């Protein structure tokens, strides 16, 4: 029998395409989804929910509604942005379009709740302008990344919420856009073309498939492929839920935690409503509001640009919420502390307005806010290797945050044989930051290129830890080594916190680091003693770096004295000086977007194979002097005296 080879080729292609769709079919079809076929609205809103919201926005949700209405009014006045190819900072990603997707839900919801035609007309205008943009990202990114994820989500909501009011012409234009944009994103994610398709621990995947799913939910019953636009995100998010660690912390930092949690929650709430599936599984989700709580600065120091600990690629201000996120978590887990923190964020005016409309859906006014006053002042996030330690919860406390763990956490390191999304991690094992008297005393480098030298830790022959040397952390290197820097001890009493960690595995084998054990003695309220026990296979040039918040200082005897803008004095004193040289200078480091970063750096240097170094940090507010720390050795034991207290380290 003769067989036409070209027909075989066609058949093979069809089988592959069918397999790709079959993998993401909803089988069996969830009853909740089947029940909404032919009805709108269905995403978060239903006719009953609309009636309920029209009542609550005049009572329990009135203040939250005023914020939403103000943002909707502002969007009406300014109109949608004109297309521009280059926004001057985000390159091919065209991230200016994210705000378009973020704004449309405000207008759509205001239209539904007020029935004011101004909002419907503005929502339609914003939506049609979005559809008309010639690109959603440039080149290979067009239609494949964050600007698409945001716009798909926003357009899906207006299509669903304002379905009747839009008219068939606008609905048809939206459907055409969905078929083009959502269809392309689905194919890219399903086929592996999208670089983020298996980045299960990274914000790009979460944002993009959430946007895709919203379109699928909105169009289910109207387009055959809508089922698969739901099924693919469901498969991806199931894998993410299995991969998240146990402690609620994020390797990407608090800013990307906000971004990722917003879009995960958006999908998870829809999955509960329309798929009957609860994805709030495992230990990560009930613990993650605590990550936000412990990584925020003392609240009396909060400002819009300074309220978070900026580990990893992170701003000090908020990107997304976190009031909305905290209210969602509070409602899901009946968490009064998350409810309290959301209120504090709103009261301080430090919230980011990207999706404040979610407050109307996620706020439970019957849940009593609980301040954190009965929480421990120290929390060890054991999977990610982060310890947050503070003197109290007064709002004026001192805060020290320490990091020493695998780049994606202990759990994920054992699961993945490729990097599932560690690009925003920093090479910073055994690094710490310090905030006291309302100011940064020892700082992080922020959202920058990835260099260990920009952190408060060890260099060996001028080299840092595995993964450094580029704009994005090169996680495949420590992953292949299964490098597990780790925290060994984290204990707290009223007067003293003790943290011990070993970062030796963060360094490449050629560095010869056999031990880099860091002991931190937080002598509350105003002293920190750092003891480093370093052992190498052979003598190397070793350098311990510390980066004060103030950008200048002076030497006073053996100590370095720095003063902040508000007058706080920080005293840094090397205590074990035999064979150690010290320096204090401005180091020009590699910042973000090619900009220089100037870091005032206090450093200790020694060429040796064995080094036990002790450094004391003490501080005092304006008008007072930090207490000096004295030091004595007794064999292998080290004793430190701060005022009338003596603490020590014994082998």
Language-model features and meaning:
Residues 60, 68-83, 375-378, 385-388, ...:
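Beta-sandwich/jelly-roll carbohydrate-recognition scaffolds of carbohydrate-active enzymes
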Residues 72-99, 132-144:
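Internal amphipathic alpha-helical repeat/solenoid segments
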Residues 39-59, 101-117, 129-137, 151-169, ...:
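Well-ordered alpha-helical scaffold segments within catalytic/enzyme domains
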Residues 61, 68-80, 121-138, 173-195, ...:
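Long, well-ordered core segments of solenoidal/helical folds
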Residues 63-72, 107-125, 163-181, 217-235, ...:
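An acidic intrinsically disordered interaction segment
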Residues 82-92, 143, 150-255, 266, ...:
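Active-site lining segments of carbohydrate-active enzymes
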């Amino acid at each position: 029998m003769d067989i036409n080879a070209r027909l075989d080729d066609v058949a093979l292609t069809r089988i592959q395409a069918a397999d790709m769709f079959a993998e993401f079919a909803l089988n069996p079809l969830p009853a909740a989804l089947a029940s909404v076929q032919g009805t709108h609205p269905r995403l978060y809103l239903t006719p009953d929910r609309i009636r309920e919201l029209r009542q609550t926005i005049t009572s329990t949700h009135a203040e939250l509604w005023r914020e939403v209405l103000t943002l909707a009014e502002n969007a009406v006045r300014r109109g949608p942005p004109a297309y521009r190819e280059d926004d001057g900072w985000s390159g091919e990603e065209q991230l200016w379009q994210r705000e378009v997707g973020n704004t449309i839900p405000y207008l759509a919801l205001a239209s539904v709740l007020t029935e004011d035609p101004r909002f419907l007309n503005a929502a339609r205008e914003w939506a049609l302008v979005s559809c008309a943009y010639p690109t959603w990202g440039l080149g290979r990114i067009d239609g494949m990344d964050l600007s698409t994820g945001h716009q798909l989500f926003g357009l899906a909501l207006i299509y669903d919420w304002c379905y009747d009011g839009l008219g068939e012409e606008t609905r048809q234009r939206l459907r055409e856009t969905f078929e083009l944009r959502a269809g392309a994103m689905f194919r890219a994610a399903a086929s592996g073309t999208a670089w983020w398709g298996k980045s299960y621990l990274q914000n790009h995947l979460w944002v993009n498939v959430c946007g895709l799913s919203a379109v699928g939910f909105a169009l289910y019953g109207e387009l055959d492929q809508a089922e698969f636009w739901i099924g693919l995100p469901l498969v991806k998010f199931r894998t993410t839920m299995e991969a998240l660690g146990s402690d609620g912390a994020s390797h990407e930092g608090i800013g990307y935690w906000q971004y990722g949690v917003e879009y995960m929650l958006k999908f998870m709430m829809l999955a509960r409503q329309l798929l009957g599936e609860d994805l709030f599984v495992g230990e990560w989700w009930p613990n993650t509001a605590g990550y936000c709580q412990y990584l925020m600065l003392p609240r009396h120091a909060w400002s819009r640009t300074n309220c978070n600990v900026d580990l990893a690629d992170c701003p000090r201000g908020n990107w997304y919420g976190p009031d909305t996120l905290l209210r969602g978590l509070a409602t899901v887990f009946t968490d009064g502390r998350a409810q309290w923190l959301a209120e504090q964020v709103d009261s301080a005016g430090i919230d980011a307005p990207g999706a404040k409309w979610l407050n109307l859906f996620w706020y439970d006014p019957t849940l009593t806010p609980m301040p954190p006053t009965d929480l421990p002042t120290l929390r060890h996030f054991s999977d990610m290797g982060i310890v947050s330690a503070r003197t109290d919860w007064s709002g004026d406390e001192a805060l020290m945050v320490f990091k020493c763990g695998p780049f994606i956490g202990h759990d994920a390191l054992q699961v993945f044989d490729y990097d599932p999304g560690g690009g925003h991690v920093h090479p910073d094992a055994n690094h710490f930051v310090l905030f006291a008297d309302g100011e940064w005393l020892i700082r992080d480098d922020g959202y920058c290129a990835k260099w260990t030298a920009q952190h408060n830790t060890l260099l060996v022959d001028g080299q840092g830890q595995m993964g450094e040397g580029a704009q994005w952390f090169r996680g495949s290197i420590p992953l292949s080594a299964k490098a597990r820097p780790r925290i060994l001890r984290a204990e707290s009493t009223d007067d003293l916190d003790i943290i011990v960690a070993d970062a030796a595995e963060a360094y490449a084998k050629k560095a010869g680091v056999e031990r880099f054990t860091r002991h931190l003695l937080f002598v509350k309220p105003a002293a920190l003693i750092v003891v480093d026990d370093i052992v190498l296979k052979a003598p190397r040039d070793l350098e311990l770096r510390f980066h004060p918040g103030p950008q200048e200082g002076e030497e006073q005897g053996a100590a370095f004295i720095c003063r902040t803008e508000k007058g706080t004095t920080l005293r840094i004193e090397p205590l074990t000086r035999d064979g150690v040289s010290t320096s204090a200078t401005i180091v020009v480091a590699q910042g973000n977007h090619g900009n220089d970063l100037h870091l005032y750096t206090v450093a200790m240097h020694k060429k040796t194979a064995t080094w036990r170094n002790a450094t004391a940090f003490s501080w005092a507010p304006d008008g007072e002097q930090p207490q000096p720390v004295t030091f004595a050795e007794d064999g292998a034991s080290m004793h430190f005296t701060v005022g009338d207290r003596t603490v020590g380290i014994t082998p």
